[in-house]
Amino acid sequence: MHEDIAKWFSDPKHGADTQDMDLVLADVEFLPQLKAYLDDPAGTEFKKVEVVSALLELLEHDCPPDRGAESVRLAEDIRTTIRQHADVAQRAMSDVGPVKEVVLRSILGLPVPPDYPQWIVDRAHEEGA
């Protein structure tokens, strides 16, 4: 693992000001560390939200249903992880944008606000809702 990424997981202050860290972390190679960070009581709230966002990026980009059984297993693992950390996922909703919010709502079994445009809901389904 790259030294900066290892430090991001181990040092609560490291990388807190790094923009788009969720995109950097959205790598299947880091999935065990992402899951462990969500389980870590010492993990910061801000970074846990980044982890949820990274998981959503993985779900969107690495789990298309037409890629076969491996992709389906990965998607279910990510969804299960998000469900296990529903409290963090719900707090992340205001930070991930409307499409990913709908993805989270779908994973958590929460209703989509009725005033959300249909295109947002449709896009969320494309991204793993």
What is each residue range found by the language model?
Residues 1-2, 109-112, 121:
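Intrinsically disordered, low-complexity regions enriched in Ser/Pro/Gly/Gln/His and often acidic
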Residues 1-35:
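Short terminal alpha-helical segments
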Residues 21-23, 28-117:
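Extended alpha-helical scaffolding segments
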